[in-house]
């Protein structure tokens, strides 16, 4: 099976903004750095954090349907190459936000304006039954962690390793990468 050049997607679209004070690339790099600091050697969790918004880089900008379904689309994009856990976390990081909004009013009040808008597009807080079903999944805690890093990874002053630091991890799952800049 041919690989997926993730770095080419970041090079082509990673410098775009998505309503926050950082670019898509910076957001992904901050998420990966947060996951790496918290999870140590859990490469699957770091990979999910790095790629949780990959679908934004693979579809035309300005499409609300992309915002609503980007978790599912991102998971489908990476699923042929990564362990099921990574794809599940990517797929459910939006549901994790919807879960937190349903169970934690403080979390909801702390969302950025862009996240509040995307929450509405994504269907709002989860219903009780859906929240309970999600919470029962064995990888639920991982999706919550990625969600929290997703919320935190919006600091325009943050210093992170460059994308090139993650190329060995990407190549382990996706094959050769063609990164031309750090």
Residue ranges and their predicted role:
Residues 1-182:
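Metal-dependent phosphohydrolase cores
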């Amino acid at each position: 099976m041919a690989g997926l050049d993730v770095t080419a997607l970041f090079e082509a679209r990673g410098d775009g903004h998505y309503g926050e004070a950082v670019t898509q690339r910076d957001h992904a790099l901050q998420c990966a750095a947060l996951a790496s600091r918290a999870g140590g050697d859990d490469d699957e969790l770091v990979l999910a954090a790095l790629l949780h918004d990959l679908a934004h880089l693979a579809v035309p900008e300005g499409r609300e349907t992309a915002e609503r379904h980007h978790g599912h689309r991102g998971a489908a994009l990476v699923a042929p190459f990564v362990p099921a856990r990574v794809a599940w976390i990517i797929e459910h990081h939006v549901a994790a936000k919807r879960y937190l909004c349903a169970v934690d009013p403080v979390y909801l009040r702390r969302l950025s304006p862009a996240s509040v808008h995307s929450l509405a597009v994504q269907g709002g807080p989860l219903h009780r039954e859906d929240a309970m079903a999600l919470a029962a999944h064995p990888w639920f805690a991982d999706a919550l962690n990625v969600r929290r890093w997703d919320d935190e990874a919006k600091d325009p002053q943050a210093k992170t390793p460059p994308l090139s630091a993650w190329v060995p991890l990407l190549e382990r799952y996706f094959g050769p990468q063609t990164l031309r800049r750090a």
